[in-house]
Amino acid sequence: MAVTISDVCAVVPAAGFGRRMQTECPKQYLSIGDKTILEHTVAALLANPRVTRVVIAISPGDARFAALPLANHPQITVVDGGTERADSVLAGIRAAGNVAWVLVHDAARPCLHPDDLARLLAISQTSTVGGILAAPVRDTMKRAEPGLNHIAHTVERVDLWHALTPQFFPRELLHDCLTRALNEGATITDEASALEYCGFHPELVEGRADNIKVTRPEDLQLAEFYLTRMTYQENA
């Protein structure tokens, strides 16, 4: 398929284990219905016609992935991930080919709504820096005393946002910012933080709060509820 300006490659870092799920199986391979979380995640990305390819970064020798239908999907490319998320994302970017923009999405975030994805992708028409899906903070935020479960003070929530994924950036810009940040020992918690480190200010695109990341055991049932509701609404 010829690459055009509108083509987008998604990168899904899936080399992590997720110990907070308290399971022997990495969380991306836990099942919701008849599919794994990873399969739901990839399906949500490929549902948008602009996403023509998905690069999945997995742990070397990951036998669980090899057993999935995704392993033989014509739009899926697999690469070995690294020890840290940023290393896996860089490996995915290098395999993305000659696309102008890349979309990075958590492997364990299966409830991405198609409207959110479409609005995020639309910023490529107006932005040279990119942006992320995010949700305004709604709860009162407290900062704890260092190392203690005691309140130090209340944090003003005005202008505070929860960073979500996908995060969407020009491919070369994200590659260069991640590389520089890693080389200089910066703490990179998501892709946007690499751009921030290099002096850029990505856009915040408001997304749905039900775009949850499956992190703890109780998240699994919640994700199943959201996916079931989304399927019902699409078929209504």
Swiss-Prot record:
InterPro entries given in the database record: IspD, IspD/TarI, IspD/TarI_cytidylyltransf_bact, ISPD_synthase_CS, Nucleotide-diphossugar_trans
Protein name: 2-C-methyl-D-erythritol 4-phosphate cytidylyltransferase
Keywords from the UniProt entry: Isoprene biosynthesis, Nucleotidyltransferase, Transferase
Annotated catalysed reactions: 2-C-methyl-D-erythritol 4-phosphate + CTP + H(+) = 4-CDP-2-C-methyl-D-erythritol + diphosphate
Residues at the site labelled Transition state stabilizer: 20, 27
Similarity annotation: Belongs to the IspD/TarI cytidylyltransferase family. IspD subfamily.
Originating organism: Enterobacter sp. (strain 638)
Assembly and interaction partners: Homodimer.
GO BP annotations listed: isopentenyl diphosphate biosynthetic process, methylerythritol 4-phosphate pathway
Highest taxon above the source species: Bacteria
Function: Catalyzes the formation of 4-diphosphocytidyl-2-C-methyl-D-erythritol from CTP and 2-C-methyl-D-erythritol 4-phosphate (MEP).
Enzyme class: transferase
Pathways per UniProt: Isoprenoid biosynthesis; isopentenyl diphosphate biosynthesis via DXP pathway; isopentenyl diphosphate from 1-deoxy-D-xylulose 5-phosphate: step 2/6
Matches recorded under Pfam families: IspD (PF01128)
Site (Positions MEP for the nucleophilic attack): residue numbering on this chain: 157, 213
CDD domains per the UniProt record, alphabetical: CDP-ME_synthetase
EC number: 2.7.7.60
A GO MF term: 2-C-methyl-D-erythritol 4-phosphate cytidylyltransferase activity
